[in-house]
From Swiss-Prot:
Modified residues annotated as Phosphoserine in this record: S678
Lineage, broadest ranks: Eukaryota, Viridiplantae, Streptophyta, Embryophyta, Tracheophyta
Leading EC class: transferase
Region spans: Disordered: 200-224, 614-700
Binding site for ATP: 19-24, 43, 51-54, 67, 112-117
Chain sites annotated for binding Zn(2+): C153, C156, C432, C435
Metal-binding is among the record's keywords: yes
Composition bias, Acidic residues: 675-685
Key words of the record: Acetylation, ATP-binding, Metal-binding, Nucleotide-binding, Nucleus, Phosphoprotein, Transferase, Ubl conjugation pathway, Zinc
Protein name: SUMO-activating enzyme subunit 2
Pathway info: Protein modification; protein sumoylation
N-acetylalanine modified-residue sites: A2
């Protein structure tokens, strides 16, 4: 039972919720029933049919409407006396600035992507407002508390490559291939070959309620005398053509997004496919055989080959024809199986056609099968548990019970007989570039990299800045904003196409850049290190190690040793004789000619990194290591052995002894897999405690 003090704190609190999806619906309900009376909600998404099975505040009549607005209206029906304000907008919009965040006592996150989470984290730091972060994936979940100066911020620990991928509004605005896979697998395949009575988002073509649902249903119904190929073309034109055109009618949706391209079969396929192949007649497989395939008749043999739009369209039609010709008895009862060759071919083709429409890179059958076979569906119960934990931590924040703050993990299997694992929050990471003043180090080829590379790949992608400003000394090299005149915009755009060493204020080895984001009120320093060796040695450093020995006949040798890290390579050079200069040795490597000097031994060892190889030889470092106070190794080696992970269920251990607790047991980390979240709301950032102390970050 809450004390009078708790009730007063709850009643008078002004709370900001970011996200009104799976966690958000549960959270808003729990906040309202717990006594909170002033709640603001931000969410840019609209309601989809696929949301209805777990986002209980929404009904079928709400499909296409704002999640934030409908959630508000639903809660006000049973708590009419409280104040709830909704915003159907992107939290990164300029109106949600630091001053906007300062009005709240606590911010509660139920977001689905890293970019938005980082943005909210920085605004909370700038506004000095506590943040309660959360996420779920399947049966796993986590809730963390972030208080400026007292606990680590959301970005104090580096986030490993995502093991789960959020599928944001897969039916309307896909941005990744996995979104297209989920659409093809859970919507289109299920609609055509699964339970006909199960509603999904393909039943709704637009937000126009005047459109006939019966007309839409008729598209998916095949009459007995309808030619299979014509039926396939009808489905093709509906889902890839008319549905896309209907989506384009909503101008607000595409205001800041790339507009998709409607695709019709007549523009891609020949008039008739009957003469092109006769697979439905010549196929000798038995009815129901999972190995029936559309590929042989189309001359497609390699599953790792990337199909173009025409090939994907042919596979789409041919696979659909084979389902009706060879597996008709199964239609109406089929579910996707990654071992069903024809199902995988159909889903791959459909996903690739949709990806082509939305400007997303295509994938091979082999790649698509791997993605489609690792779908992790959302669990409503996990969302409810996490929402309750968020409210518990929010109440502690309002009471300022710092000693009682907990980071809580919801586990799939009991650990020490517990499914909920609470631990004390971590101290701020002194090496964090977001909540501390740690300078960054950027190793880059200043003569071959342009300012655009720095802005796009480092400042925006890696540092997550939205409105960056870049200064070198007193020279302003780049800035964005609505208040710039045309001349300034032209000058900054011209700078983007210049190499770093050729800018008005050249960026060279040893240059120190100041990078700021005025919207996030974030500023950091970047020390630039020019990567000279990568210009010449990269082409020859292809093997793991090699040894070159030249004739050694001269006395009085001296040794010069150079150890560097270049593109993941530890390089040791031992030179003999004083007149063997570095330049002459490099000339030998470039031309292939042997020098007449006594000795050259070159040892090369490739280091292993968890992140993907960076483009253009850029490496950003200086902010990724965990603080020594949390027990992480301070070694600079990337090949260090993994540190042991200590779990604490009671939170009684000192902060200096704790480790990052994984959401899953250590045994579950033995096999690295990529999980794909099939829903569109509340994705948990799975953090591997064995990987948080890496020194280098590879630029994606």
């Amino acid at each position: 039972m809450a004390t009078q003090q708790q009730q007063s704190a709850i009643k008078g609190a002004k709370v900001l919720m970011v996200g009104a999806g799976g966690i958000g619906c549960e959270l808003l309900k729990t906040l309202a029933l717990s006594g909170f009376e002033d709640i603001h909600i931000i969410d840019m998404d609209t309601i989809e049919v696929s949301n209805l099975n777990r986002q209980f505040l929404f009904r079928r009549s709400h499909v296409g409407q704002s999640k934030a607005k409908v959630a508000r209206d639903a809660v006000l029906r049973f708590r009419p006396n409280i104040n709830i304000r909704s915003y159907h907008a992107n939290v990164k919009n300029p109106e949600f600035d630091v001053d906007f965040f300062k009005q709240f006592d606590v911010v509660l996150n139920g977001l689905d992507n890293l970019d938005a989470r980082r943005h909210v984290n920085r605004l909370c730091l700038a506004a000095d407002v506590p943040l309660v972060e959360s996420g779920t994936t399947g049966f796993l979940g986590q809730v963390t508390v972030h208080i400026k100066g007292k606990t680590e911020c959301y970005e104090c620990q580096t986030k490993p490559a995502p093991k789960t991928y959020p599928v944001c509004t897969i039916t309307s605005t896909p941005t990744k291939f996995v979104h297209c896979i989920v659409w093809a697998k859970d919507l289109l395949f299920a609609k055509l070959f699964g339970d006909k009575n199960q509603d999904n988002d393909l039943n709704v073509r637009s937000n126009n309620s005047a459109s006939s649902s019966k007309e839409t249903e008729d598209v998916f119904e095949r009459s007995e005398d309808e030619d299979i190929e014509q039926y396939g073309r009808k489905i093709y034109d509906h889902v890839f053509g008319s549905n896309i055109e209907a989506a384009l009618s909503n101008e607000e949706t595409w205001k800041n997004r790339r507009r998709p391209r409607p695709i019709y079969s007549k523009d891609v396929l020949p008039e008739s496919l009957t003469q092109q192949n006769g697979s439905t007649q010549n196929c000798s497989v038995t009815d129901g055989d999972l190995m029936v395939s559309a590929m042989p008749s189309l001359g497609l043999k390699n599953p790792q080959e990337l199909w173009g739009l025409t090939q994907n369209s042919l596979v789409f039609i041919e696979a659909l024809k084979l389902f009706f010709a060879k597996r008709k008895k199964e239609i109406g009862h089929l579910t996707f199986d990654k071992d069903d060759q024809l199902a995988v071919e159909f889903v791959t083709a459909a996903a690739n056609i949709r990806a082509e429409s939305f400007g997303i890179p295509l994938h091979s059958l082999f790649e698509a099968k791997g993605i489609a076979g690792n779908i992790v569906h959302a669990v409503a119960t996990t969302n409810a548990i996490i929402a309750g934990l968020i409210v518990i931590e929010a109440i502690k924040v309002l009471k300022k019970d710092v000693d009682k703050f907990r980071m809580t993990y919801c586990l799939e299997h009991p650990s020490k007989k517990l499914l909920l694992m609470p631990i004390e929050p971590y101290e701020p990471n002194p090496a964090c570039y977001v909540c501390s003043e740690t300078p960054l180090v950027l190793e880059i080829n200043t003569r071959k990299s342009k300012l655009r590379d720095l802005v796009d790949k480092i400042v925006k992608t890696k540092l997550g800045m939205n409105l960056p400003l870049i200064m070198h000394g007193n020279s302003l090299l780049y800035e964005v904003g609505d208040d710039l005149d045309d001349i300034m915009v032209a000058n900054y755009n011209a700078n983007l196409e210049k190499y770093l060493s050729e800018l008005p204020s050249p960026i060279l080895n040893g240059s120190i850049l100041t990078v700021e984001d005025l919207q996030q009120e974030l500023s950091c320093k970047i020390n630039v290190k020019h990567r000279f060796f990568s210009e010449i040695l990269n082409p020859v450093l292809n093997s793991v190690w090699f040894l070159i020995i030249l004739p050694s006949t001269f006395p009085k040798l001296f040794h010069f040793t150079e150890s560097r890290n270049q593109d993941g390579l530890s390089l040791d050079i031992i030179l003999g004789f004083s007149n063997v200069t570095i330049r002459r040795v490099l000339t030998m490597f470039e031309t292939g000619r042997r020098l007449t000097h006594p000795l050259l031994i070159l040892f090369c060892h490739r280091e292993e990194f968890d992140e993907e190889k960076e483009p253009e030889g850029m490496v950003l470092s200086g902010w990724t290591p965990s603080p020594a106070t949390n027990g992480e190794s301070a070694s600079t080696s990337n090949n260090e052995n993994p540190v042991d992970v200590t779990e604490s269920s009671s939170g009684s251990e000192p902060a200096s002894k704790k480790r990052r607790l994984s959401e899953t047991e250590a045994s579950n980390h033995k096999k690295e897999t990529e999980n794909v979240e099939s829903e569109d709301d509340d994705i948990m950032e799975v953090e591997n405690p064995m990987m948080v102390s890496k020194k280098k970050i590879r630029v994606e």
